[in-house]
Amino acid sequence: MKRAFLGILAVAALVFARPAGGEDVSGWQGAKWGMTSDQVQKVLNYPTLVADLASVCGEKCDEGAALQLDDYDLSGQHFMVRFWFTKPEMRLHAVSMYAKPGSDAGDNGGFTKIKDYLQTVHGSPQSVGLNRGRFVYTWPLPSTTVTLNSNATNQTTIVYEEKTGKAGGGS
């Protein structure tokens, strides 16, 4: 009787357990949505620089500020990471990761490795599409949308964006 109960309990735990993939991230690497740039710099274990908005975003920039991390290794691939802050509140709302030139993430093998890594972490993407010759994979999580965008040859970008009531966001 006790063994049968434990068996039923184990099956119930498997049925109702949340899958490892698809867990909400609410930000990126300890930097949570809504943090100020000072708070983000304190929680990261990497040196960041204040990015010049005019050069990284253009004249018609909807961002309030940006921090930049020049080299981040994700699954053996190197990325430049930007943290985007809202205007005028200056709160973190998006993180963009750009594959560095010469990084394997920019070629087809590197793209596949990053896609597989994201699928391991977040589960299967909800949508897969092609937009102007670029592959777009999207993982909508409860408070964050993760988007992998690549031409599968030399450009790969990953964007973590806070879900809000409005569309748009980080660059």
Regions picked out by a protein language model, each given a short descriptive name:
Residues 1-8:
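Bacterial N-terminal signal peptides that target proteins for export
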Residues 6, 53, 67-69:
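Extended hydrophobic/Leu-rich segments
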Residues 12, 17-19:
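N-terminal signal peptide c-region/cleavage motif recognized by signal peptidases
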Residues 20-64, 89, 94-171:
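Non-cytosolic coordination micro-motifs
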Residues 68-88:
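Compositionally biased P/S/T/G-rich terminal and signal peptide-adjacent segments
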